[in-house]
Amino acid sequence: MSAVESHRRWDCFRILFEGPIGALDLDKTWWVYGELDQLAGTLALSDPKFAQYLPRAYDYWFTHLVDKEYGEVWNNVDGRTHAPVRQAPKQWEWKNAYHSFEHALIGYIVGQQLNDQPITLYYAFSSVEVARAALPYFYSGVIKGIAVNQGQPLQKVTFGNVH
């Protein structure tokens, strides 16, 4: 059993330049957990056995990485205490405007599909004809319906069978 498996943590890794055999870094980095959550979710869409990892991974994310008082996600969590490391700002444009949003979007899509629920996304395409080619982010899926609000360039697209 590897050190990672024995600690049952996804983001433990060896730092090869510390000591003769390396050192185990137990700290949690938001980006690593976010990407691995998304990977496990994406894999679960193709092979349901990967869904078993999602409750534990998302529980850690919401319990320890999300700042419940002020919002957003801590950059790092101390692996021994599970307390946030407050040494850097929580926010910058590529983190909040991209990665945090993407984590939420993929979590929504995967959760809905695994629970056999419709996936509803909103688009601002120039026409309904263009909306007919919409995809649920970088996944494939079947469009179950398109609704348009009169006078608004907004299409509500409902998907199923996302993979």
Annotate each PLM feature.
Residues 1-163:
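Glycan-recognition and catalytic cores of secretory/periplasmic carbohydrate-active enzymes
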